[in-house]
Structures are given as structure tokens and as C-alpha cells.
């Protein structure tokens, strides 16, 4: 395998030419490895190698297009610089259109060759640095150890190198919007706007406004089935342009096949997403992620609330692992925050003291539990009613009525 000290992989079937180029490039300070056949050379290229390929365009059994296809099977961003004779210029031009870095016509101008090599190496180092940053970011910030999570990170890293449209689908709280946000943050359009809209029949007519706001960035549309066929065709046309004005991300609860079967997505838009749809699994499908996620959100909540991180008893941890978590990560994060302030996060968890008491009517138990939940929410948000209502996902008026019922005052929780 080539290490990163070797910066140029040189291919030419003429040994004398190979030696001449090798000598010239080594005198210029580059580490070169020469090969007389591209198939042999390909075996020496490791993943994320920081070098480039410099090759003759016409060799027995291998054209410039063949060579580019061979090397781009594993990494379509590996720079390939072609050297061509006069009669092979059309082939070299075609190869550049299909992804080769550039080409030089024989006789080669050494000065121009060195400039192209340095530009290609600079670009290559930038690509590898971004990949490493993406990998480290996703490893640290996307919590989980399941096989699905490993594949999710890898898929996001791969797609972040493109600006192609992506479809995320699954239940609420499974990471659909998180995936969309990381695609933007780690992608080519990271400096552009991140525009997100939950489409409804009422706002679908504002699509052009959403598109204008997303220029140069990422447009995330939840429930694109609310768009008319004409609007869907328009989105598909924009994504088919050579230079896409923005990255399109679709978010839904169903797969594209299910959307198509229900006649909710136009064929043109379907094919924009067809190769890049990502199924986001529920927590019940990836139980290996539950414990690390709970511990992550517990530490996060304790840091924000300035509380010590409590120990998680073995039985409680077993209960957390057994729970289905129907609202997925969102529900798990809320449970971790409640545990940070002393509330056991499982609805089925019973206070041992209650087992020694006479049976309590169900309505009273429900009221006691509701009062406890509201009390803890007031503690967490220090009596700020808007935040408490949003946290509990109930209207402010309903929250005030419940507080009045249980004799709770927001003033007692402000500190």
C-alpha cells in the first residue's frame, strides 16, 4: 500500500518514459511510485490516500475512461491527471468531463505539469482533511454503538461530499432532522443557509419563497406530498441542473416506495431521491444505542442545570433498556433530564413506599403523577411558563389550570 509520503502514483506502459517522469518529479521534491499497468497500480492505493494519479491516456487494454472508472470505483474524488498524444485529445476531454482532474498534451511542459500537480495535491489534501473532520464529528456527536448507527454515520459522511438530494424517513425522533442538519453542516453548502419547512396544505404555495431563501445552502422539506405535481416537477428540474442552486432534503414517515404507491410523489421527484433514501430506525430497533444515548443526555442535562451526574442503578438501567420509547430519542432525552433532577424516568417505576400503603384509587395516582411531572418541569425551567408549556407540550392556559388545581405557583420556582 502507498503511504502518504508517496504523493504521486505514475502510470505509463513505456518504461523509459516512466523513468524520465519519475526522475523529473523526484527532482521537484515529490515521492513517486511508478507502474507500467493501471490494474497493478490500483492494488496499491489505500483508502483516503493523500496523493494523486498521473497517467498516460492510451495504453494497451486500458483507455483514459477505463483508467478513471477503475480508480473512481472506490473514491470518485481521487484526482487523475492524464497525459495524452495529439490523436487522443478527444478521449482525454471526454475523461475530464466524466471526472478526471485535467490533461496535458505531449510534449509536456514541465512547468505547467508541476503547477497542475500542486493544484491537484492541494485539492486532495483538502478533501481528505474534510473527510477526517466529518468522521470525527459524526463519531463524537452522533451517539450510539449499534450497527445501524455505524452505517448511518458512514452514509452521512459519504453523502456530505456531494450535493445530491437525500430522503430521510422513519418515525418522529429517530434522527431524520439530525441527519439533514449534519449533511448541511459537513457538506459543500455549509456556509449557505439551512432552511427547514414543515409543509402543510396552507403553506405549500410558498415553495418559491422557500427556494429563494435556500439558495447556496440546503432546503429541508417535511411532507413534500403536500406539493402539487407541478411544484414537485419544478423541484426535480432544479435538482437535475449541472450546478444545483441548493441541496434538497426530503423528510417523511414513509419510504419512497410507499409514497409512490399512495400516489403522493411525482415520478421525477421520486428519482431525485431514489438512490439516496435513508431509513431511520426507531430506538426499539436498535437497543444497543439506548444506554449511551441516555447517559449522553443525562450528562448534558446535569451540566446545563449545574447538578451532579447521578448514578444509574442496575435495575433502573434494565428498565430503561426494556422500554419501547415510542417517541424515540426525544422521549429518552426528556426522561434523562427528569432523572437529572431526581425523577425516575419510567412511568412503570413504583416508589417502594407505595407498596406498603393501602391501594390508592387510579384517579388519585394519576393526579399525583401529573403533579410531580409539572413540579419537576417548573424546577427545570425555573418557573418560566412558556418553556414549561413547550416542554410538556400543552397550551399555557391548560398548564395554568393544572397548576391552580395542584396549588402550584411559578414564583416558588424562580431562583
From Swiss-Prot:
Supply the alphabetized keyword list: Activator, ATP-binding, Cytoplasm, DNA-binding, Nucleotide-binding, Phosphoprotein, Transcription, Transcription regulation, Two-component regulatory system
SUPFAM superfamilies tied to this protein: CheY-like (SSF52172), Homeodomain-like (SSF46689), P-loop containing nucleoside triphosphate hydrolases (SSF52540)
One Pfam family this sequence matches: HTH_8
According to the UniProt record, list the residues that bear 4-aspartylphosphate. 56
Q: Which GO terms describe its cellular component?
A: cytoplasm; protein-DNA complex
Tell me the residue numbers annotated for binding ATP: 170-177
Subcellular compartments: Cytoplasm
Q: Which residues bind DNA?
A: 385-404
Q: Does the keyword Transcription apply?
A: yes
* Gene3D superfamilies xrefs: 1.10.8.60, 3.40.50.2300, Homeodomain-like, P-loop containing nucleotide triphosphate hydrolases
The keyword ATP-binding appears for this protein: yes
**Response regulatory domain residues:** 7-121
In this chain the Sigma-54 factor interaction domain maps to 142-341
Give the protein's recorded name. Phosphoglycerate transport system transcriptional regulatory protein PgtA
Q: Which organism is it from?
A: Salmonella typhimurium (strain LT2 / SGSC1412 / ATCC 700720)
